[in-house]
Amino acid sequence: MALHEGFDPSGSPSFLGSKGTKEFDDLVATVRRDFPAIAQARLAFVTEEKDLIPEGLAYDTNQNLFYLGSLNRKKIVKIDAEGRVSDFVPANRYDLLPVLGIRLDPADGTVWANTFEDAGRTELVHFDSAGKLLGRFAPKDGAAKHGFNDLVVRKNGEVITTDSLNNKVFRLDPQSGAFLALPVYRTLFYPNGIALADDDRSLYVADAVGIVKVDLADNSSRDVDPGPRNTTAAADGLYWHNGSLIAVQNGMGSPRIAAFKLSRDGNRVTRVTVLENRTQFTTLPTTGAIRGNDFYFIANSQIDNLNGDKIMDVTKLAAVRIAVVRLP
């Protein structure tokens, strides 16, 4: 808050004990004055299966449909252009772990998804366009915990995934099934969102501190300079769009959707556009997907109502809403 970067503590459970005090209320009022609510999104889809607890969303350009992963049901559903929802990978078919990030292979349209449970067991799974399992890959390095979270797929089919529990980024060698750690110049703190630029070389990894850029050609890395009065921290979802990074920031107090325009070399933020802030669509967003110039995102993941494999309060469950906002 002292850095004046837009952090709104009213949405963070860490500050529950301070709510209602004059000092806290004054701080919140200052933040909200300088970083006002922005409402540009609209409702796109609703899924009536209230206990999905969705975390991953991906768009299939060829079939014009979305894939939505479920933490609670441990399955993947698809949503067609008319908003009809059906199972893509039904629960219990392949004994999946809770489903997180989902991305498509740009070459063949197959679907990759990360799965992991809080205890530290994780798998990267691969499906064809009909939902048939093509492969499943788990780390075999003996580490106590792994948690594959989000991922990208390169033009050659290589998969790169964040590991939130091991604080690393891994590349999958599809021939051997081994995961190779990507060298990063600093320690990562709960790496989560990940995006790949159109050059198929510049990789952006979001963690609790900010965004790290990795050059996949020479493995050099550096922090993306957020610029003054801005934070790139805590992006759950991160996506590349026309020289900008689209971020779902849900770990910085009150969540927001933001677009970070980058310099030509991709090393610094030159302009920040807050797309949605403190509205009904930023209750607890997690990830999203880009279709054309529109960004679709999970508006109310309800992830805070899930403890391990259990819904804490079923009376609080609501229909899952997917919102959409126009990109700059």
Predicted segment positions?
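TPR/TPR-like alpha-solenoid helical repeat scaffolds
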Residues: L3-R32
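Asp-box/WD-like beta-propeller blade repeats and closely related beta-sheet repeat scaffolds
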Residues: R33, A37-L43, G120-E158, T162, ...
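Beta-strand-rich domains and repeat architectures in extracellular enzymes and scaffolds
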Residues: F35-V77, L317-R321
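A short beta-strand motif characteristic of beta-propeller blades
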Residues: Q40-E48, R84-Y94, K132-D141, A178-Y185, ...
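Beta-rich, blade/repeat-based domains predominating
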Residues: E48-Q63, L71, R93-E117, K140-V159, ...
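Short loop/turn segments immediately following the C-termini of beta-strands
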Residues: L71, F116-D118, S164-N166, P174, ...
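Short loop/turn segments that connect beta-strands within beta-propeller blades
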Residues: I79-R84, D128-K132, D173-G177, D215-S220, ...
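Short, conserved, GDST-rich strand-edge loop motifs in beta-rich repeat architectures
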Residues: N114-R121, N300-A319
